[in-house]
Amino acid sequence: MEYNTSALCDIYMDQVDVVEPMFSNFGGRASFAGQITTVKCFEDNALIRETLEQDGVGRVLLVDGGGSLRRALLDGELAAIAEENEWEGIVVYGCVREVDELEDMNIGIQALASIPVGAAMQGVGEVDVPVNFGGVTFLPEDYLYADTTGIILSQEPLSADLEEDEEEPELLD
């Protein structure tokens, strides 16, 4: 399904938080949305792998990597695991690598930048905790919508049907 964050903001401005514009697209899917699962880690991607090995249908992985530009938290191998487990997308407040592989995958991926240096795999970090970056606090189970224009967050699912004439719009679960 395609999502348009500009249209969603026009309709739901009082219900959404807008993440500061700092992310670039790296995945093969231009827009994505889902209920978030958070991972907070710094230059270590073991918990990211563990989380991506779970069923990802209807989910977006939101990674707070502390904004580090020194090591990539996501690479082609981890993105392939995410794609295999049907994650909708991944947002990394940090870096990715192997960007040519990432852009060929059917998954949304946004991150600050790319760097060839990989992350450690010590398992240091936390899962499903509130995280804050980009002027927004992300809570586990919030709903994230992303496209090439930006990223927005809502506590409730937003209508997938942007026709204003509909009496009862279909909600995303």
UniProtKB/Swiss-Prot annotation:
Any single GO CC term annotated in Swiss-Prot or TrEMBL for this entry: cytoplasm
Taxonomy, superkingdom: Bacteria
Gene Ontology molecular functions: endoribonuclease inhibitor activity; enzyme binding
Keyword Nucleus: no
Pfam families reported in the protein's UniProt record: RraA-like
Chief location bin: cytoplasm
CDD domains per UniProt: RraA_family (cd16841)
Keyword tags: Cytoplasm
Localization terms from the record: Cytoplasm
One of the protein's GO biological processes: regulation of RNA metabolic process
InterPro entries: RraA, RraA/RraA-like, RraA/RraA-like_sf, RraA_gpbac
Subunit structure, interactors included: Homotrimer. Binds to both RNA-binding sites in the C-terminal region of Rne and to RhlB.
Role: Globally modulates RNA abundance by binding to RNase E (Rne) and regulating its endonucleolytic activity. Can modulate Rne action in a substrate-dependent manner by altering the composition of the degradosome. Modulates RNA-binding and helicase activities of the degradosome.
NCBIfam families reported for this sequence: NOT-MenG, PRK09372.1, RraA_entero
Family: Belongs to the RraA family.
PANTHER family documented for this protein: 4-HYDROXY-4-METHYL-2-OXOGLUTARATE ALDOLASE 3-RELATED, REGULATOR OF RIBONUCLEASE ACTIVITY A
Name of the protein in question: Regulator of ribonuclease activity A
Organism whose genome encodes this protein: Vibrio vulnificus (strain CMCP6)
Gene that this sequence comes from: rraA
